[in-house]
């Protein structure tokens, strides 16, 4: 099955797991494009940061879920399955939605939370150019509860005050009945309070404030043939986890003087994907295509020891 729940991670965010596998093995796509960064950027219980960029509900047309391994097509991070969120596009008139919510707890030991999101989409040039803008914010108060029972773990969901922001826009150009070009930008900012060491010890590698930042730019081209559809896109995204610090026990002796300095955790990915979708009979679909990825990651622990930046380039061709 598919589980969407707030786990016992340090941020209290939502995680999606499929068929009992950890959330790190569920790949999240929006309009077929990868969104989150590697779990190596969010180590030690911060993986839920990668799900803080979902579009507003009004922007979603449908959600496609593939349960089971899709590693051949998407890589090892799709061993559990794939969730593809399809957004609304090419509206023939302007549509807008604004939503606000407030969750009030009965006990003042639990933090209240509020949400606000908006979405608007419509034509700029009739039957040719359309624009979509979207955004959301979530504010959560801290919780003074540290344990649910005498035997429970000290860490629980919703442990600390946080502010999450997401803003994005998409431009579609229908050049002809068969050709569509699109451009999409998205930015996410998350902030978590750690003044009392709720997320990690202030003397053990954590700053007083932890932040997660993600920027994404995508451009694509879709062409419709009589026998199928050709889809291509170029996607660049950069994610950074700020607020971690270097500690002596992970540094070489001659690097102990760096203890207490900020630990850089930053990743960037460039992905070029192109595929052809064509029906086979009345109930089958054939997918043929290829993908190229260029990735780099910086970890302050490795940088302090060797100065090395991890880099990887890979390509693949596939048929399904």
Residues covered by each model-derived region:
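Outer-membrane beta-barrel pore domains and translocons
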Residues: 68, 86, 99-105, 134-138, ...
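Transmembrane beta-barrel wall of Gram-negative outer-membrane proteins
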Residues: 109-141, 147-191, 213-220, 279-283
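Extracytoplasmic beta-strand/coil segments of soluble accessory domains associated
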Residues: 1-37, 61-62
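Extracytoplasmic loops and strand-loop junctions of Gram-negative outer membrane beta-barrel proteins
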Residues: 44-48, 65-66, 99-103, 149-155, ...
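Transmembrane beta-barrel architecture of outer-membrane proteins
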Residues: 13, 78-80, 101, 113-117, ...
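Face-selective signature of the C-terminal outer-membrane beta-barrel domain
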Residues: 172-190, 210-320
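Short acidic/polar hinge/loop motifs at secondary-structure boundaries
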Residues: 17, 33-67, 118
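Outer-membrane beta-barrel translocator/receptor signature
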Residues: 43-46, 58-61, 72-84, 88-146, ...
């Amino acid at each position: 099955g598919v589980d969407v729940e707030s786990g016992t991670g340090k941020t209290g965010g939502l995680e999606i797991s499929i068929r009992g596998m950890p959330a790190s093995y569920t790949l999240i796509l929006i309009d077929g494009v990868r969104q989150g960064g590697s779990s190596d950027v969010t180590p030690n219980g911060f993986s839920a940061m990668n799900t803080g960029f979902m579009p507003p509900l009004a922007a979603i047309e449908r959600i496609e879920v593939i349960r089971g391994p899709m590693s051949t097509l998407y890589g090892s991070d799709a061993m559990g399955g794939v969730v593809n969120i399809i957004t609304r596009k090419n509206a023939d008139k302007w549509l807008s939605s604004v939503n606000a919510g407030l969750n009030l707890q009965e006990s003042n030991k639990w933090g209240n939370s509020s949400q606000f999101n908006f979405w608007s989409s419509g034509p700029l040039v009739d039957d040719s150019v359309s624009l979509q803008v979207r955004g959301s914010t979530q504010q959560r108060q801290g919780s003074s509860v540290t344990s649910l029972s005498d035997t429970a773990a000290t860490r629980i969901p919703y442990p600390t005050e946080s502010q999450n922001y997401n803003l994005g826009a998409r431009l579609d150009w229908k050049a002809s009945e068969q050709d569509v070009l699109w451009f999409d930008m998205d930015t996410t900012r998350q902030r978590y309070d750690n003044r009392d060491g709720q997320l990690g010890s202030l003397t053990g590698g954590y700053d007083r404030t932890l932040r997660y930042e993600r920027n994404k730019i995508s451009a694509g081209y879709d062409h419709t043939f009589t026998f199928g559809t050709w889809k291509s896109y170029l996607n660049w995204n950069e994610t950074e986890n700020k607020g971690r610090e270097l500690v002596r026990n992970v540094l070489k002796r001659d690097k102990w003087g760096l203890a207490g300095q900020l630990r850089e955790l930053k990743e960037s990915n460039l992905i070029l994907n192109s595929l052809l979708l064509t029906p086979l009979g009345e109930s089958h679909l054939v997918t043929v295509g290829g993908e190229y990825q260029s990735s780099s990651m910086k970890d302050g622990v490795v940088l302090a020891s060797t100065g090395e930046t991890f880099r990887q380039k890979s390509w693949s061709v596939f048929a399904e």
